């Protein structure tokens, strides 16, 4: 009879097959199953295994290589799969209330399989449903059961054809009619059509629609959200006054039906206003708990934070999949060697390590951040339910909004660069569609622009940081926040006076070194950005121009540096906590160090310019430390990706399978494609009229 640990392992995950990757696994400094257990916990691992095995054993989820479906069929199949996911009961409300992280886990597991499927489910449950919870009142919660049971299907309609990032300029209107106690939704023209709305194209029956609220006195009360029926759930035909359609084929995620909608004087009950941030009485009087219009708008758009936090996790999953495939490939692909008779795995080359392993470290660091920021958001939503003070929610909401606004750019851009690097790392085989790099690249691409353009979002984070200097709190505590991400700024003047006095590789390998450097960097960029902004405002007299002219070399790098520090700080605390098993401390510590130094190395010029470091040797020592960490992590790389990898079926890449049989798997997949050995159906065109040269030459 096996030990309890062996029995637990067998429940958590299947044994990894023997094969060409076994040599690297044998050299690992830790047990990958122990890392799985620490990283996710048994409950989540069991949940993952259930999801993966369920998908693999259901013929509806089969995906033969090389099969391209017509757009309409792709949309149909994706909805059937979405429906099946709900039929399996994965969205168990009671279970997810006990462990909210399972919501994120489910989204990620489905996304590893197909983001069209995951996003269809997420937009319905996590975005549409969460907006009702976060922005509505108790009388709106009756819709939640209908959402869980798929009696209605939802979407989130904010963006319009002519406006996206500038939410205050949305033009859809909602005039209140006290005579009937209804709001009248209207699109003034086609440019005000709701656009790019996921699920709206073919399937949504209901939408959270953002519109400018007008009271009977003619005043515009700003952007508010309304629950609007779009289609009849029994027929899927549009409701009266609603014009709704599908946008067509996209670069990726074509199973997801993005659509548009216009409203022609559509009447909805007064109760359909999601009234957490503002309400209208039956007589038409407007009430809001917020004194400041901007604060109310921020609270109204708080649901955007959930979407952006979801995108952080989506991006991390894409990065993880690319890194898993590329590292397994690199550990089995042999090219060149010290002699003509010996070839070595390309993972043994320092250049390959330097190209890949920092992205592996980033995948771990950002994965941890995505989980923690998601749980922060859940706590904020719970605080709203139990009646936490408006001031407390505002403070937490502003901080989470700032983190989500910079977290999405950092995660999506890191994934974008990482996927491309991994595609190139595996050479020509990475260009073959069945190996998934093209799909990952296309599916990740919209993460950089939807739910807010990355460069615009970064301005919201820098505005948050600058406000700490511009608007000191009454009690004098300028730099405190509920999540403590800005608390280090209390030492702002002292940090600016610090310098990195050491210059050796060992000095950079001190786990506090990159954190201290990043704290200085954020303080330096905050000071530079504030000074630049003040100078611009003084010379131009316009706050609008001053902020725009402070972005490129000031506010933009400030927001990114602050976000990198936050991710690094959380990862460092996690990997150095007492809960880390002794056998995992070294490898996780190295991942934390590599992520920190790799990110920091991209700011070397600023560190020199600001005087934090000096001398040629200091910068070289940082580079040497990065290369040493890559060498130290090389033998652990395969085990590290094993700990975060899905099943082979879900990974869906012949060159990334766990057995490492690179060439056998790729050859088999190529031969399994439909028609691969058949003569071209258009072969007669090849044989007919052979003498074609110059036949159509111009006679002029």
From Swiss-Prot:
The keyword Kinase does not apply. The modification Phosphoserine is found at residue 10. It catalyses: a 2,3-saturated acyl-CoA + O2 = a (2E)-enoyl-CoA + H2O2; (2S)-pristanoyl-CoA + O2 = (2E)-pristenoyl-CoA + H2O2; tetracosanoyl-CoA + O2 = (2E)-tetracosenoyl-CoA + H2O2; hexadecanoyl-CoA + O2 = (2E)-hexadecenoyl-CoA + H2O2. The modification N6-succinyllysine is found at residue 505. It is an enzyme of class 1 (oxidoreductase). The keyword Oxidoreductase applies. Disulfide bonds: none annotated. Its EC number is 1.3.3.6. One of its GO terms (molecular function) is flavin adenine dinucleotide binding. Its cofactor is FAD. Keywords: FAD, Fatty acid metabolism, Flavoprotein, Lipid metabolism, Oxidoreductase, Peroxisome, Phosphoprotein. A motif (Microbody targeting signal) lies at residues 698-700. Pfam families: ACOX, ACOX_C_alpha1, Acyl-CoA_dh_M. This is Peroxisomal acyl-coenzyme A oxidase 3. It comes from Rattus norvegicus (Rat).
